[in-house]
Amino acid sequence: MIKSFNQPDAWIKRISAYAGINEELAKRHEVVSIQQINFEGEYLQNDVSYHFLKFRLPSKYFPVTLNKDIKQQQPDIVVIQGTHFPIQVLLLRLKLGSKTRIIVHHHAERPFTGIKKMFQRLADRHIDAYLFASRQMGLSWVKKGNLASPQKIHEVMEVSSVFHQIDKVEAKGFTGIKKKLVYLWVGRLNANKDPIATVKGFLKFAQRYPDAVLYMIYHNDELLPDVYELLEEHPNGNAVKMIGQAANNELLYWYNSADFFVSGSHYEGSGTAVCEAMSCGCIPVVTNIDSFRMITNNGNCGLLYQPGNVDELCKVLLQTVEIDKAEKRRLCLEYFRDHLSFSAIARGIEEIAASL
């Protein structure tokens, strides 16, 4: 239970990157979304019926009340958010019977090992479809033996973006950015996101293009001392601006102020910030991992490099100076609309559900 939230509208706003998918589905279907915060009751917003339920700890593993509520809805389709609930899936299937279709939506989880893997394989027999941001990610679960059939794996983005493109002059008026070569980082400062390799690669690039600036927005400062140490020791350290936290609504202006979005992630379930950046026409310079290949249409909408490879990052950053930015921006916006938007994700889920 998310105890810090006790108002339904505040919580729905907090999960807007997910809620927008349900709102699109609700335009054509009856949608019930079950949530758990410090509130109990029903709440209707944008045609989505939210059921806020409270459970004690044992109910997390043996969700009798939850399954009873689900059965009362008489659903045709149940979408479970997350792949790490095999016991709960088994109990739900027992409650619902065989007619209701169960779809599981992957959210960055890794395949279980040991006895948990056994339960995952058992639950797999009772699941009709899986949604992964990248089909290749789902196939890796099949290869490891956690899931049995590649036929159940479908490629559907995990989240979308509430942001949109606005005038760059307006955006820069808010952020105060005056530079022409603007790059943006949004994410945690941890080992997986690899800000160290990112900063090293950018500083190397900035030696060639001293007018280039990387703005870093973050809400986790795990590696902040290491980043500062890098910047203090480098002669071009002022090419990286450590912004810190930014309110979610302010990100609209940051994404629209930047020309390029930079990520150093070694693993992502999807890539929320990359998706948000693309919705604003900000071109991604990201690592060559499964989820980012899907989000960038195999690099067609951006530039890819190997995680942790400082020299390769510098090389692709040098390419950003030469490419046709207007054309790349157009490709970003077009691909976002057709594959990453709320309407595109909802359409994909509808098509999969209809095929079951």
Predicted features along the sequence, with ranges:
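Short alpha-helical donor nucleotide-sugar binding micro-motif in glycosyltransferases
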Residues: 245-246, 253-258
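A short, active-site helix/loop in glycosyltransferases that binds the activated sugar's phosphate group
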Residues: 37, 126-152, 160-162
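Aromatic "clamp/platform" in nucleotide-sugar-dependent glycosyltransferases that forms part
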Residues: 266
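Conserved donor-binding/catalytic core segment of Leloir-type glycosyltransferases
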Residues: 176-193, 199-202, 215
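Nucleotide-activated donor-binding/catalytic signature segment of Leloir-type glycosyltransferases, i.e.
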Residues: 227-246
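Short hydrophobic beta-strand element within catalytic cores of glycosyltransferases
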Residues: 283-286
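Conserved acidic donor-binding segment of nucleotide-sugar-dependent glycosyltransferases
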Residues: 298-299, 303-310, 318-325
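Glycosyltransferase donor-sugar binding loop
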Residues: 186, 213-228, 244
